[in-house]
Amino acid sequence: MAGQKIRIRLKSYDHEVIDSSARKIVDTVTRAGATVVGPVPLPTEKNVFCVIRSPHKYKDSRDHFEMRTHKRLIDIIDPTPKAVDSLMRLDLPADVNIEIKL
């Protein structure tokens, strides 16, 4: 796998969970003998929702809710077969979305 690069993108609503998952990926791949760049924090996506509190009138009374999506990027340069195998066996939390590109 010489000259290849694996790019891993992590997304989660909880920043502590995504940081621990990124740390676990970096530790696993480093132990397997591959070079790792990252985790690089990408900009946090913020969605704000405005909801009217009352079902009938009082339109001026509103609630604002927000949802933040935290993102991290990890690059694995020249991955070894052992690193790829250990990456596939890694157990991560369900609330972390993982995208892997070769």
From Swiss-Prot:
GO molecular function: structural constituent of ribosome; tRNA binding
InterPro entries xrefs: Ribosomal_uS10, Ribosomal_uS10_CS, Ribosomal_uS10_dom, Ribosomal_uS10_dom_sf
Record keywords, A-Z: Ribonucleoprotein, Ribosomal protein
GO biological process: translation
Gene3D superfamilies: Ribosomal protein S10 domain (3.30.70.600)
Coiled coil location: none
PROSITE patterns per the UniProt record, alphabetical: RIBOSOMAL_S10 (PS00361)
Record bears the keyword Hydrolase: no
CC per GO annotation: ribonucleoprotein complex; ribosome
Keyword Plastid recorded: no
Assigned protein family: Belongs to the universal ribosomal protein uS10 family.
Function of the protein: Involved in the binding of tRNA to the ribosomes.
Subunit structure: Part of the 30S ribosomal subunit.
Protein name, as recorded: Small ribosomal subunit protein uS10
Organism: Beutenbergia cavernae (strain ATCC BAA-8 / DSM 12333 / CCUG 43141 / JCM 11478 / NBRC 16432 / NCIMB 13614 / HKI 0122)
Gene: rpsJ
